[in-house]
Amino acid sequence: DLRMSRGLGDVYKRQLIQEYTELLIYRISETSLVKDRDFKLVLIDDRSLNAFAAPGGIIGVNAGLFIHADNEGQFASVIAHELAHVSQRHFARGILRGQDTNLASALVLISSIALAIVSNNPTAFIAGPAALAQEQLRYSRVFEREADRFGFNNLINAGYDPKTSLLYTSPSPRDIRRSRM
């Protein structure tokens, strides 16, 4: 069970949690596609079930993950998912895609304004930005599915029973909010 004893002092508990989580991250990263394994763990005092990965090897884990995970497999599945974001370079790919879409966004915006003027229909302006927002959501979901797939495979390679993982049960985004890296 991942829930820590209430009898332990806060400093000692935090140190145990830090060490446990770092060991778990390194254990799972050994079977992952992550090349640079220089991680920096950030523990966040937030009860929501969340974790994230950021550039520079930063792995953030909310306290809620310890509270809500029923077993190590569930906890490990979230870590594996975040490591998949790192190995697949989702943050960098998102930035590169953002640079590509800036010009497209400007063109869509100008076209939407022109359409609204020509058609004498101000609501025509909404179609372009709505389509852009929909495309961004689709792209984000692609990253999440990719991280689920790579994370799930890595979880198995790391020796975890996939039936105990959160990736196996496919929780809804409301159940686990994950970063877009």
Predicted segments with their positions:
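An active-site-proximal "capping" alpha-helix that borders the catalytic cofactor pocket
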Residues: 1, 6, 21, 143-157
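Hydrophobic or amphipathic, alpha-helical segments that drive membrane association/targeting
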Residues: 1-52, 125, 133
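Single conserved hydrophobic/aromatic residue that forms the stacking wall/gate
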Residues: 2-8, 12, 168-181
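Second-shell loop/turn segments in exported
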Residues: 9-14, 64-66, 74, 96, ...
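Active-site scaffold of zinc-dependent metalloenzymes
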Residues: 49-72, 89
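Short alpha-helix carrying the canonical HExxH Zn2+-binding catalytic motif
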Residues: 72-84
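Catalytic Zn2+-binding segment of zinc metalloproteases
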Residues: 83-99
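Membrane-active amphipathic alpha-helices enriched in small hydrophobic residues
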Residues: 103-118, 126-130
